[in-house]
Regions:
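N-terminal signal-anchor transmembrane alpha helix
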Residues: 4-22
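Interfacial loop at the N-terminal end of multi-pass membrane proteins
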Residues: 17-51, 99-105
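Core segments of alpha-helical transmembrane spans in multipass integral membrane proteins
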Residues: 36-66, 83, 117, 121
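Individual transmembrane alpha-helices with interfacial aromatic-anchor signatures
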Residues: 52, 80, 104-122
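Loop-to-transmembrane helix junctions at the membrane interface
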Residues: 67-82
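Hydrophobic alpha-helical membrane segments
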Residues: 79-93
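Transmembrane alpha-helical segments of integral membrane proteins
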Residues: 90-102
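Membrane-water interface at the C-terminal end of transmembrane alpha helices
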Residues: 117-137
Length: 140
């Protein structure tokens, strides 16, 4: 599977999860407060008006990575993804060292073993896309 398909697939999966949460479902948590604490480390709304725009953003990013018809635009999209992931990775590493989060929370452990490693992996894939000629396929 090509790197850009992996990146797009992750964004489609994230879009689906956000749409799922917009229905009021709280899996993998037992309630919205627990979900918010586990996903974000603080209490925030998972109301449709909050999560549906995020779902739409992930769909737009997935389509842009797969279907953009300009190499320059493709590089800008992937560079934007990489920049966002770099910021999230940096924040995740800070939280991994216990700064700004309590090590007794679900968020701390999810961040340590899932969120930050996932961001590092996606960042590496995005950087690989920027370094290779795979994006030339997007112009065809």
């Amino acid at each position: 599977m090509k790197a850009r398909q992996v990146v797009a697939g992750v964004h489609v999966l994230l879009a689906a999860v956000h749409v799922y949460w917009a229905t009021g479902a709280t899996w993998p948590a037992i309630d919205q407060r627990s979900l918010s604490q586990a996903v974000l480390g603080q209490e925030v709304s998972f109301a449709p008006q909050v999560v549906l725009p995020l779902a739409a953003l992930h769909v737009v990013l997935a389509v842009a990575v797969l279907k953009v018809d300009s190499l320059r635009l493709a590089r800008l999209v992937v560079a934007g993804l990489a920049a966002g992931l770099a910021v999230r990775t940096a924040a995740g590493l800070v939280w991994d060292f216990g700064l700004g989060t309590d090590s007794g929370t679900a968020f701390y452990w999810l961040n340590l073993f899932f969120y930050t490693p996932a961001c590092i992996t996606l960042l590496a894939v995005d950087l690989r896309l920027l370094r290779t000629r795979q994006l030339t396929e997007l112009a065809a």
